[in-house]
């Protein structure tokens, strides 16, 4: 606040989750002055990931796009972009990377999960810390049902769901919700079988694109009799950014090709197409990530 800067100067200020902070939101601190008219903050450090989801902006792209050549020259291409992204873009364009650093040690994802996003989105630069859960091997599942065996054998898996007919409500998918509940049951059984009880309310996260599917999944979890089902977080990928769970299940939900745009947020970054929604969804998982959806429709993306 202005009152604070009248009595104290700061050597440095950190902006965390900087890729979600728009320039007007940062302006007050960037321009802060002391009573003597000096800069109240000596320097700024921006920490964020422009390959994950940006700030939520309700205005359409046609209204946020910047077409002024002089503004484009300073990296201002879209007012929906964060200052972090603009400064990073300018640095990469200049070929001078002195002011850009990469925190490439990650302690969240098991390497089997991280491998995909590392290759597709991060140029192979990510490395595990490694923490104990990142060194775990697959759990044995002798005599288990096929779904439990699938959960035991993969850390990054896809389950194809093809309903007999498209759902009447195109924002809810009961067949996928059923599979999500079955998969949660399989994880509970698998870890219980190996003497490692899990609490789904703390360990399992479910990502869906629509509010209608949230209600559908919650209903199926409760019908399945899953312990503390009402406390399992079922939400959109935007709401999951910044959080993590041992197991993430992503119910894509869509049943019609025209809905594909809802699932992705593709941005051209560093010469590569980065799907920021998919990146966020996968990187929430510590031990396993499962995607549930209609393969034929999803392959159209």
Which role does the model predict for each range below?
Residues 1-301:
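Conserved helicase motor core of SF1/SF2 NTP-dependent helicases
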């Amino acid at each position: 606040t202005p009152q604070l800067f009248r009595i104290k100067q700061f050597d440095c200020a950190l902006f965390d989750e900087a890729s979600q902070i728009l320039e007007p939101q940062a302006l007050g601190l960037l321009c802060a002055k002391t009573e003597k008219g000096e800069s109240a903050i000596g320097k700024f450090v921006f920490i964020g990931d422009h390959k994950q989801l940006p700030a939520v902006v309700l205005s359409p792209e046609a209204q946020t796009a910047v077409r002024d050549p002089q503004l484009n020259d300073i990296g201002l291409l879209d007012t929906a972009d964060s200052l972090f992204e603009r400064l990073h873009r300018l640095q990469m364009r200049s070929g001078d990377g002195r002011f850009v650093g990469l925190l490439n040690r990650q302690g969240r994802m098991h390497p089997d999960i991280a491998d995909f996003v590392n290759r597709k989105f991060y140029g192979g630069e990510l490395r595990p810390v490694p923490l104990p859960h990142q060194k775990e091997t697959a759990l044995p599942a002798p005599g288990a049902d096929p779904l439990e065996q699938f959960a035991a054998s993969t850390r990054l898996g896809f389950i194809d769901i093809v309903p007999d007919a498209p759902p009447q409500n195109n924002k809810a998918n009961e067949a996928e919700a059923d599979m999500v509940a079955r998969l949660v049951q399989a994880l509970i059984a698998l870890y219980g079988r190996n003497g490692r009880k899990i609490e789904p309310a703390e360990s399992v996260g479910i990502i869906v694109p629509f509010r209608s599917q949230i209600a559908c999944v919650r209903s199926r979890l409760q019908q399945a009799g899953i312990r503390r089902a009402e406390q399992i977080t079922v939400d959109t990928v935007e709401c999951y950014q910044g959080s993590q769970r041992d197991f993430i299940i992503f119910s894509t939900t869509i049943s019609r090709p025209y809905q594909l745009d809802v699932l992705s947020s593709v941005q051209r970054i560093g010469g590569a197409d980065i799907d920021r929604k998919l990146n966020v969804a996968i990187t929430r998982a510590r031990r396993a990530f499962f995607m549930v959806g209609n393969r034929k429709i999803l392959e159209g993306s």
